[in-house]
């Protein structure tokens, strides 16, 4: 996200100022005008679209159950039922665990989710394939795997407060240019070892 933001800023001819916050506070920062937009793999949802505007999607992913490699009990999404999952409170992935009647162990972030799975304190965590690809890129010897993957594609985009039409229009134009030039694919391959900038 940082590299995509820098590429966008360069394309737009502006300087970017990063504000690092916890996931659960990201969107709240938009509400309080702490920053102009959020670029942190925010999934486009009907609920969020009621209150916010989104750029065109810049990454695509799928929900995935991430477990230890030796876990043989969880092989499909419905296997969530009756198992413990580490999840951040406001993520879309917590809703998946609730839907399949799994038990949620609340955490603050992805790193904590992974840590609890690695320690065997939970059976797994549900997140997107992007998070797992990034984990493997940073930690190739990880003891975790994708045990099951959902079929619903998730589109991630930059998120803005409604009414920032000029900013949205310019960001969309810049994203299209970065896609066309191959820059988004290049960044994607660098961090995920696969191109997630297209469906």
Locate the predicted segments by residue.
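Acidic, polar ligand-binding/catalytic clefts
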Residues: 2, 6, 10, 15-79
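Alpha-to-beta junction loops
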Residues: 13-15, 31-40, 84, 118-131, ...
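Ligand-binding clefts/hinges and TM-proximal coupling segments of bilobed small-molecule sensing domains
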Residues: 92-107, 143-148, 173-199
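Periplasmic-binding protein-like
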Residues: 60-67, 133-176, 194-199
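Extended ligand-binding regions for polar small-molecule ligands
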Residues: 2-11, 71, 89-91, 155-194
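A ligand-binding cleft/hinge motif common to bilobed small-molecule-binding domains
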Residues: 25, 42-50, 96-99, 123-153
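Short helix-initiation/N-cap motifs at beta->coil->alpha
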Residues: 17-28, 72, 90, 105-119, ...
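Bilobed "Venus flytrap"/periplasmic-binding protein-like clamshell domains
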Residues: 1-10, 62-110, 114, 129-133
